[in-house]
Every structure is written in structure tokens, then in C-alpha cells.
Curated annotation (Swiss-Prot):
Pathway: Carbohydrate degradation; pentose phosphate pathway; D-ribose 5-phosphate from D-ribulose 5-phosphate (non-oxidative stage): step 1/1. The keyword Magnesium does not apply. Pfam families: Rib_5-P_isom_A. Keywords: Isomerase. This is Ribose-5-phosphate isomerase A. It catalyses: aldehydo-D-ribose 5-phosphate = D-ribulose 5-phosphate. InterPro entries: NagB/RpiA_transferase-like (IPR037171), Ribose5P_isomerase_typA_subgr (IPR020672), Ribose5P_isomerase_type_A (IPR004788). The active site is at E111. GO terms for molecular function: ribose-5-phosphate isomerase activity. Substrate binds at T34, G35, S36, T37, D89, G90, A91, D92, K102, G103, G104, G105, K129. Catalyzes the reversible conversion of ribose-5-phosphate to ribulose 5-phosphate. Its EC number is 5.3.1.6. It comes from Protochlamydia amoebophila (strain UWE25).
Length: 232
């Protein structure tokens, strides 16, 4: 993981990811998040496993699972896990109360389930993800494919502006759970993320939102100069 030719942004992500690996100990059951920063974490964790670290892990996405297996991290079936020791995941935005927007990578439902099943969730970010208030980044909302157009219409009728996520070929994006994502764009910063989450979840067909709260433990911030800071 040489940093010689890395951009400042990549240097920040790698710095945070490498620091996070230090918190993983032998015999732990680890939850693996999804995203660009977590990809660096998985790469570094794989090297520790190759050097003798004994852990097991579950992944929040097929993408993270494939990468983990490729670098030698033992992956177990999520159905066998009652509790995880630690989840390492990123965020699209995080505020001073450790409320987050997640889901840019499309794995919000599994990410929230894994975090909820963990003794601690360590959030790994670069400095650009720090915000005073959430809302500049779209809020991913996972919705059922059954009557999905009605669900989207209902959300729009109640003032939620956004669009269904699509692939590069403009086909509708499907999550690993087989659902669609409606990305909601808030016109102003979100004053009460918990209220918005609960309101969205009250609509039939809304399975999960990318608003995360009461889940983050320590936060590892990577900076473009290669330094890190840990917020307890």
C-alpha cells in the first residue's frame, strides 16, 4: 500500500484505514463495511491475516466479501453470528453528534444490521466527511421492488425530492438484497435526522434509510497530510 503517488484524498483514506487495523485483535469477529476507505482497510487487514492474525468476519456487501476472500480474510455466514466484536465502516457524512449519512455504496441495510449487532462500530473517514449538519450528501433509501413506483410517488407526494439510483447503463440499481434505492436530496441541512429517519420508515415499502445514529463509537479521521485523529 505505497503512498508515494497517492493524491491527498487517497492518502487521507489510507491513513485512517491503516490506523483502524490496529484495533483488530486475535479471535475477534469483525464486521466489514463497504466503500472506498473500507477497501483500503480490507487490504491492510488481509496482510495482517496473512501474517498470522486469527479472526473471522462478515461483510456488508458482496463487493467487500469478494475482496476479503481475495486477500485471505476468513468470511463466515452471517446466519451463524449472534454478536460481533467490532465493525469497521465508513460514512458519507458525519456530524459532531456522530449522526451519519451512509449508503453511497448501496449497502445501507446490511451496514446498519452489522453495526447494530456489534459491540462497537469504528467509523473510518477522511476529513472531507466531517460536517456541522447532515444533508448535503443524498440520503439513500432502500425500497421494495414490489410496487416501487407507488412508493416513490408516495415519497414525492410528501415532499421528498430525489431519484431512483441507476447503473452506468441507466438500468435501475439493485442492492445485494434485490431492492431499489431512492436517493433523497434535502434542500436544506437536516435539523433532526432521527425524525426524518422515523418519518421515512413510516411509509410502507421503505425498508431502511441511510441515516445512522446511536451506532458510531470511535471515529478515526484521516487527513491529507497522512496524519490521523481518533475521536472517542
Amino acid at each position: 500500500m505505497t503512498q508515494t503517488n497517492d493524491s491527498p484524498s487517497i492518502k487521507a483514506k489510507k491513513a485512517a484505514a491503516l490506523k483502524a487495523v490496529e484495533f483488530v485483535q486475535d479471535q475477534m469477529i469483525i464486521g466489514l463495511g463497504t466503500g472506498s476507505t473500507i477497501a483500503y482497510f480490507i487490504e491492510a487487514l488481509g496482510k495482517r491475516c496473512q501474517a498470522g492474525l486469527k479472526i473471522t468476519a462478515i461483510a456488508s456487501s458482496e463487493r467487500s466479501m469478494r475482496q476479503a476472500r481475495l486477500v485471505g480474510i476468513p468470511i463466515v455466514d452471517s446466519d451463524t453470528i449472534l454478536e460481533l466484536d467490532l465493525t469497521i465502516d465508513g460514512a458519507d457524512e458525519i456530524d459532531p453528534l456522530k449522526q451519519m449519512i451512509k449508503g453511497g455504496g448501496g449497502a445501507l441495510l446490511r451496514e446498519k444490521l452489522i453495526a447494530s449487532a456489534s459491540k462497537e462500530m469504528i467509523v473510518v473517514i477522511d476529513e472531507t466527511k466531517l460536517v456541522n449538519k447532515l444533508g448535503k450528501f443524498p440520503v439513500a433509501t432502500e425500497i421494495s421492488i414490489f410496487t416501487f413506483r407507488h412508493i416513490v410517488k408516495k415519497l414525492k407526494d410528501h415532499g421528498y425530492c430525489g431519484s431512483l439510483r441507476v447503473n452506468q447503463d441507466q438500468s435501475l440499481y439493485r442492492t445485494d438484497n434485490g431492492n431499489y434505492i431512492f436517493d433523497i436530496c434535502f434542500p436544506e441541512p437536516i435539523d433532526n435526522p432521527i425524525f426524518e429517519h422515523n418519518r421515512l420508515k413510516s411509509f410502507a415499502g421503505v425498508l431502511e434509510t441511510g441515516l445512522f445514529f446511536n451506532l458510531a463509537g470511535r471515529v478515526i479521521i484521516g487527513y491529507q497530510n497522512g496524519m490521523t485523529k481518533i475521536v472517542a
